[in-house]
Amino acid sequence: MSRRSPKLELKLNLSPPTSSQRRMVRSPSRSATTSPTSPPSSCVSSEMNQDEPSVRYSTSPETTSMVLVGCPRCLMYVMLSEDDPKCPKCKSTVLLDFLHENATNANANAAAASSGRKTRRN
């Protein structure tokens, strides 16, 4: 970037995950030795079985989906849990989910219709 052209263009190209990739959890390779500072129940200190595949499917109820959203108030993109989507900076719940735009618009239209307000159709 030079002083004559301070304009910087960045593009983020993301595609929605396929249904087979949504429940897939990748585990990083772990050390076979335990650290003295890690508790024995820590995932860092647990040993990885050589016969165990490195890709596992999660059946745990604690695993939540993540969504990539934009906050119109802070003008930033963040990746958040789908269960509790709030902007980490301003705590706003008004977020733009651009990967699932059609589902979000359908939910917004249904909520507006149930509250008695009219929505503008495109």
UniProtKB/Swiss-Prot annotation:
Q: What UniProt keywords apply to this chain's record, in alphabetical order?
A: Nucleus, Repressor, Transcription, Transcription regulation
Please tell me whether the keyword Repressor is annotated for this protein. yes
Q: Name one GO cellular component term.
A: nucleus
Phenotypic effect of disruption: No visible phenotype under normal growth conditions, but the double mutant seedlings gir1 and gir2 exhibit excessive root hair formation.
UniProt GO BP: negative regulation of DNA-templated transcription; root hair cell development
Tell me what happens on changing L8S. Answer: Abolishes repressor activity and interaction with TPL
Q: List the disulfide bonds.
A: none
Q: Where, per UniProt, does this protein localize?
A: Nucleus
What other remark does the UniProt record contain for this protein? Seedlings overexpressing GIR1 exhibit reduced root hair formation.
What this protein is called in its record is Protein GL2-INTERACTING REPRESSOR 1
Corresponding gene?
GIR1
